[in-house]
From Swiss-Prot:
GO biological process: photosynthesis
UniProt GO cellular component terms: chloroplast thylakoid membrane; photosystem II reaction center
UniProt keyword list: Chloroplast, Membrane, Photosynthesis, Photosystem II, Plastid, Reaction center, Thylakoid, Transmembrane, Transmembrane helix
InterPro entries attached to this UniProt entry: PSII_PsbJ, PSII_PsbJ_sf
Transmembrane segments: 8-28
UniProt-annotated location(s): Plastid, Chloroplast thylakoid membrane
Quaternary structure and partners: PSII is composed of 1 copy each of membrane proteins PsbA, PsbB, PsbC, PsbD, PsbE, PsbF, PsbH, PsbI, PsbJ, PsbK, PsbL, PsbM, PsbT, PsbX, PsbY, PsbZ, Psb30/Ycf12, at least 3 peripheral proteins of the oxygen-evolving complex and a large number of cofactors. It forms dimeric complexes.
Bilayer topology term: Single-pass membrane protein
Natural source organism: Agrostis stolonifera
Protein name: Photosystem II reaction center protein J
Family stated for the protein in its record: Belongs to the PsbJ family.
Length: 40
């Protein structure tokens, strides 16, 4: 394990930034697939 004292763990950054990105991408592709992507 790397020493993460005084720093934010990379896995925490990845989780916090990854979940919203995956959600937005999922909504975008779902909207495009259902024909609503162009109206957004």
């Amino acid at each position: 394990m790397a020493d993460t004292t005084g720093r934010i763990p990379l896995w925490l950054i990845g989780t916090v930034t990854g979940i919203p990105v995956i959600g937005l991408v999922g909504v975008f592709f779902y909207g495009s697939y259902s024909g609503l992507g162009s109206s957004l």
